[in-house]
Regions:
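P-loop NTPase Walker
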Residues: 1-52
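Short helix-terminating capping/connector loops at secondary-structure junctions
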Residues: 3-7, 141-144, 173-175
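Conserved RecA-like ASCE P-loop NTPase motor core of nucleic-acid helicases/translocases
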Residues: 4-18, 32-34, 181, 209-211, ...
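Phosphate- and divalent-cation-binding pockets in alpha/beta enzyme and binding domains
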Residues: 21, 43, 141, 160, ...
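Short, surface-exposed amphipathic charged segments that create phosphate/polyanion-binding patches used
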Residues: 46-55, 221-226
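A polyampholytic, Gly/Pro-enriched intrinsically disordered region
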Residues: 52-65, 228-234
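Accessory N-terminal region flanking or inserted into the helicase ATPase core
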Residues: 72-150, 159-164, 190
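Conserved RecA-like helicase ATPase core segment
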Residues: 164-243
Length: 261
Protein backbone atom coordinates (compact mmCIF):
# COMPACT_ATOMS: atom_id res chain seq x y z
CA UNK A 1 0.00 0.00 0.00
CA UNK A 2 2.78 2.44 0.85
CA UNK A 3 4.56 1.93 -2.47
CA UNK A 4 1.33 2.50 -4.40
CA UNK A 5 1.00 5.83 -2.58
CA UNK A 6 4.61 6.77 -3.35
CA UNK A 7 5.65 6.36 0.27
CA UNK A 8 8.39 4.44 2.07
CA UNK A 9 9.52 3.29 5.47
CA UNK A 10 12.70 5.27 6.13
CA UNK A 11 15.62 3.74 8.00
CA UNK A 12 18.53 6.09 8.67
CA UNK A 13 21.87 5.12 10.14
CA UNK A 14 25.44 6.40 10.50
CA UNK A 15 27.64 4.67 7.94
CA UNK A 16 27.48 3.27 4.43
CA UNK A 17 28.54 -0.10 5.85
CA UNK A 18 25.55 -0.09 8.20
CA UNK A 19 23.30 0.94 5.32
CA UNK A 20 24.50 -2.00 3.23
CA UNK A 21 24.02 -4.38 6.15
CA UNK A 22 20.43 -3.24 6.71
CA UNK A 23 19.71 -3.51 2.97
CA UNK A 24 21.01 -7.06 3.04
CA UNK A 25 19.04 -8.08 6.11
CA UNK A 26 15.83 -6.66 4.64
CA UNK A 27 16.53 -8.51 1.39
CA UNK A 28 16.50 -5.22 -0.56
CA UNK A 29 12.74 -4.84 -0.07
CA UNK A 30 11.69 -1.79 -2.07
CA UNK A 31 9.28 -0.42 0.54
CA UNK A 32 12.27 0.53 2.69
CA UNK A 33 14.27 3.68 2.01
CA UNK A 34 17.61 3.07 3.72
CA UNK A 35 20.32 5.72 3.85
CA UNK A 36 22.84 7.46 6.04
CA UNK A 37 21.56 10.32 8.17
CA UNK A 38 23.52 12.83 6.09
CA UNK A 39 22.09 11.57 2.79
CA UNK A 40 18.57 11.54 4.18
CA UNK A 41 18.49 15.11 5.46
CA UNK A 42 20.37 16.50 2.46
CA UNK A 43 17.76 14.98 0.16
CA UNK A 44 15.10 16.79 2.19
CA UNK A 45 16.67 20.26 2.20
CA UNK A 46 18.80 20.44 -0.98
CA UNK A 47 16.16 22.17 -3.10
CA UNK A 48 15.68 24.94 -0.52
CA UNK A 49 18.83 26.81 -1.46
CA UNK A 50 17.78 30.24 -0.17
CA UNK A 51 17.11 28.86 3.30
CA UNK A 52 20.39 26.94 3.28
CA UNK A 53 22.30 30.09 2.34
CA UNK A 54 20.56 32.15 5.01
CA UNK A 55 21.53 29.74 7.79
CA UNK A 56 25.01 29.12 6.38
CA UNK A 57 25.77 32.84 6.49
CA UNK A 58 24.09 33.24 9.87
CA UNK A 59 26.33 30.62 11.49
CA UNK A 60 29.45 32.27 10.07
CA UNK A 61 28.29 35.67 11.32
CA UNK A 62 27.75 34.21 14.79
CA UNK A 63 31.28 32.74 14.76
CA UNK A 64 32.65 36.14 13.75
CA UNK A 65 30.87 37.83 16.67
CA UNK A 66 32.28 35.27 19.12
CA UNK A 67 35.82 35.68 17.79
CA UNK A 68 35.62 39.48 17.83
CA UNK A 69 34.43 39.37 21.43
CA UNK A 70 37.30 37.06 22.39
CA UNK A 71 39.84 39.34 20.74
CA UNK A 72 38.40 42.45 22.37
CA UNK A 73 38.49 40.84 25.81
CA UNK A 74 42.01 39.45 25.46
CA UNK A 75 44.39 41.44 27.63
CA UNK A 76 47.61 39.82 26.44
CA UNK A 77 47.66 40.31 22.70
CA UNK A 78 51.01 38.62 22.16
CA UNK A 79 50.02 34.99 22.82
CA UNK A 80 49.73 32.19 20.28
CA UNK A 81 46.05 31.85 21.14
CA UNK A 82 45.41 35.49 20.34
CA UNK A 83 47.13 35.30 16.95
CA UNK A 84 45.35 32.01 16.20
CA UNK A 85 42.02 33.71 16.84
CA UNK A 86 43.07 36.61 14.59
CA UNK A 87 43.65 34.10 11.79
CA UNK A 88 40.34 32.36 12.50
CA UNK A 89 38.53 35.69 12.31
CA UNK A 90 40.20 36.52 9.01
CA UNK A 91 39.26 33.09 7.64
CA UNK A 92 35.63 33.41 8.73
CA UNK A 93 35.30 36.84 7.16
CA UNK A 94 36.67 35.45 3.90
CA UNK A 95 34.17 32.58 4.11
CA UNK A 96 31.31 35.03 4.60
CA UNK A 97 32.38 37.09 1.58
CA UNK A 98 32.51 33.96 -0.59
CA UNK A 99 29.25 32.63 0.85
CA UNK A 100 27.37 35.71 -0.29
CA UNK A 101 28.32 34.90 -3.90
CA UNK A 102 27.20 31.26 -3.78
CA UNK A 103 24.18 30.55 -5.97
CA UNK A 104 23.95 26.82 -5.30
CA UNK A 105 25.27 24.75 -2.42
CA UNK A 106 26.38 21.19 -3.12
CA UNK A 107 27.13 18.22 -0.89
CA UNK A 108 28.56 14.74 -1.35
CA UNK A 109 27.80 12.42 1.59
CA UNK A 110 30.65 10.14 0.53
CA UNK A 111 33.31 12.76 -0.19
CA UNK A 112 35.48 15.41 1.42
CA UNK A 113 33.58 18.30 -0.24
CA UNK A 114 36.54 20.61 -0.98
CA UNK A 115 34.61 23.01 -3.25
CA UNK A 116 34.00 26.50 -1.86
CA UNK A 117 30.25 26.04 -2.32
CA UNK A 118 30.20 22.57 -0.74
CA UNK A 119 28.78 21.98 2.71
CA UNK A 120 30.73 19.97 5.25
CA UNK A 121 29.14 16.95 6.92
CA UNK A 122 28.58 18.74 10.24
CA UNK A 123 27.09 21.77 8.47
CA UNK A 124 24.52 19.61 6.69
CA UNK A 125 23.32 18.17 10.00
CA UNK A 126 23.25 21.55 11.75
CA UNK A 127 21.46 23.37 8.94
CA UNK A 128 18.96 20.59 8.24
CA UNK A 129 18.09 20.18 11.93
CA UNK A 130 17.18 23.85 12.25
CA UNK A 131 15.34 23.96 8.93
CA UNK A 132 13.23 20.91 9.78
CA UNK A 133 12.57 22.11 13.31
CA UNK A 134 11.35 25.53 12.11
CA UNK A 135 9.58 24.59 8.87
CA UNK A 136 6.10 23.11 8.96
CA UNK A 137 6.40 22.47 5.22
CA UNK A 138 9.51 20.29 5.60
CA UNK A 139 7.93 18.44 8.51
CA UNK A 140 4.86 17.73 6.40
CA UNK A 141 7.01 16.55 3.47
CA UNK A 142 8.84 14.07 5.69
CA UNK A 143 5.66 12.85 7.39
CA UNK A 144 3.85 12.31 4.08
CA UNK A 145 6.79 10.77 2.23
CA UNK A 146 8.01 8.60 5.12
CA UNK A 147 5.07 7.78 7.43
CA UNK A 148 7.39 5.48 9.39
CA UNK A 149 10.91 6.70 10.24
CA UNK A 150 13.35 4.48 12.13
CA UNK A 151 16.58 5.97 13.51
CA UNK A 152 19.39 3.46 14.00
CA UNK A 153 21.97 4.24 16.72
CA UNK A 154 19.61 6.91 18.02
CA UNK A 155 21.67 7.40 21.18
CA UNK A 156 24.45 8.95 19.07
CA UNK A 157 22.28 10.90 16.63
CA UNK A 158 22.84 14.66 16.87
CA UNK A 159 20.50 15.98 19.56
CA UNK A 160 19.25 18.89 17.41
CA UNK A 161 18.20 16.41 14.73
CA UNK A 162 16.48 14.14 17.24
CA UNK A 163 14.57 17.18 18.53
CA UNK A 164 13.51 18.00 14.96
CA UNK A 165 12.16 14.48 14.40
CA UNK A 166 10.32 14.63 17.72
CA UNK A 167 8.75 17.88 16.52
CA UNK A 168 7.40 16.05 13.46
CA UNK A 169 6.03 13.29 15.68
CA UNK A 170 4.28 15.86 17.87
CA UNK A 171 2.79 17.86 14.99
CA UNK A 172 1.88 14.96 12.68
CA UNK A 173 1.16 12.12 15.10
CA UNK A 174 -1.87 11.06 13.06
CA UNK A 175 0.21 10.19 9.97
CA UNK A 176 3.78 9.82 11.24
CA UNK A 177 5.46 7.21 13.44
CA UNK A 178 8.97 7.68 14.81
CA UNK A 179 11.03 4.72 15.99
CA UNK A 180 14.30 4.94 17.93
CA UNK A 181 16.69 2.00 17.77
CA UNK A 182 19.73 2.05 19.99
CA UNK A 183 21.37 1.32 23.30
CA UNK A 184 22.17 4.09 25.77
CA UNK A 185 25.01 1.98 27.16
CA UNK A 186 26.73 2.15 23.76
CA UNK A 187 26.61 5.94 23.52
CA UNK A 188 29.88 7.21 22.02
CA UNK A 189 29.41 10.83 21.00
CA UNK A 190 28.74 13.63 23.47
CA UNK A 191 26.62 15.59 20.98
CA UNK A 192 23.95 12.90 20.97
CA UNK A 193 20.70 13.26 22.91
CA UNK A 194 21.55 12.64 26.55
CA UNK A 195 19.14 10.36 28.46
CA UNK A 196 17.06 9.98 25.34
CA UNK A 197 14.85 7.40 27.04
CA UNK A 198 13.59 9.98 29.52
CA UNK A 199 11.95 12.12 26.82
CA UNK A 200 9.98 9.27 25.25
CA UNK A 201 6.25 9.71 25.95
CA UNK A 202 4.64 7.08 28.19
CA UNK A 203 2.19 6.07 25.47
CA UNK A 204 5.01 4.91 23.17
CA UNK A 205 5.71 1.22 22.87
CA UNK A 206 9.11 0.36 24.37
CA UNK A 207 10.24 -3.07 23.16
CA UNK A 208 13.47 -4.34 24.69
CA UNK A 209 16.00 -6.81 23.35
CA UNK A 210 16.43 -9.16 26.30
CA UNK A 211 18.54 -11.82 24.61
CA UNK A 212 22.18 -11.10 23.80
CA UNK A 213 22.99 -13.54 21.01
CA UNK A 214 26.56 -12.37 20.44
CA UNK A 215 28.48 -12.24 23.72
CA UNK A 216 29.84 -14.80 26.16
CA UNK A 217 28.12 -15.16 29.54
CA UNK A 218 30.73 -13.29 31.56
CA UNK A 219 30.70 -10.41 29.08
CA UNK A 220 26.93 -10.08 29.41
CA UNK A 221 27.20 -10.22 33.21
CA UNK A 222 29.84 -7.47 33.22
CA UNK A 223 27.84 -5.31 30.78
CA UNK A 224 24.76 -5.65 32.99
CA UNK A 225 26.75 -4.59 36.05
CA UNK A 226 28.18 -1.54 34.30
CA UNK A 227 24.95 -0.61 32.55
CA UNK A 228 22.67 -0.58 35.59
CA UNK A 229 23.87 2.94 36.43
CA UNK A 230 23.18 4.11 32.88
CA UNK A 231 19.79 2.59 32.09
CA UNK A 232 17.42 0.86 34.49
CA UNK A 233 15.83 -2.49 33.61
CA UNK A 234 18.06 -2.92 30.55
CA UNK A 235 19.72 -6.15 31.66
CA UNK A 236 20.21 -8.82 29.02
CA UNK A 237 20.47 -12.60 29.14
CA UNK A 238 23.10 -14.63 27.27
CA UNK A 239 22.21 -17.60 25.10
CA UNK A 240 22.05 -20.83 27.08
CA UNK A 241 24.67 -22.37 24.79
CA UNK A 242 26.96 -19.32 24.92
CA UNK A 243 30.57 -19.79 26.02
CA UNK A 244 31.43 -18.85 29.58
CA UNK A 245 34.03 -16.42 28.28
CA UNK A 246 36.76 -14.47 30.04
CA UNK A 247 36.88 -10.93 31.40
CA UNK A 248 40.31 -9.42 32.03
CA UNK A 249 41.14 -6.11 33.68
CA UNK A 250 44.40 -4.45 32.66
CA UNK A 251 45.98 -1.84 34.94
CA UNK A 252 48.78 0.20 33.41
CA UNK A 253 50.94 2.98 34.72
CA UNK A 254 49.90 6.38 33.43
CA UNK A 255 52.43 8.10 31.23
CA UNK A 256 52.16 11.89 31.24
CA UNK A 257 53.58 12.10 27.74
CA UNK A 258 50.56 10.38 26.20
CA UNK A 259 48.46 12.61 23.98
CA UNK A 260 44.98 12.11 25.44
CA UNK A 261 43.37 14.25 22.76
Amino acid sequence: DLLMQGKNVAVITFTNAATDEIFNRLDYTSVFHISTIHSFVWDIIRHHQADIKKLYCFYIEEDIKVLEKKLDETKNKTTKTYFANVEKLKYQKERLTKAQTIEKFVYNPNGSNPEYNALKHAEVIKISAQMINESDMLQRIIAQRYPILLIDESQDTKKELVDAFFEIQKNYADIFTLGLLGDQKQRIYTDGKENIGSIIPNKWEKPRKKMNYRCAKRIVKLANAIGKDIELHAEQDPREDANEGTVRLFVIQQYDGINKD
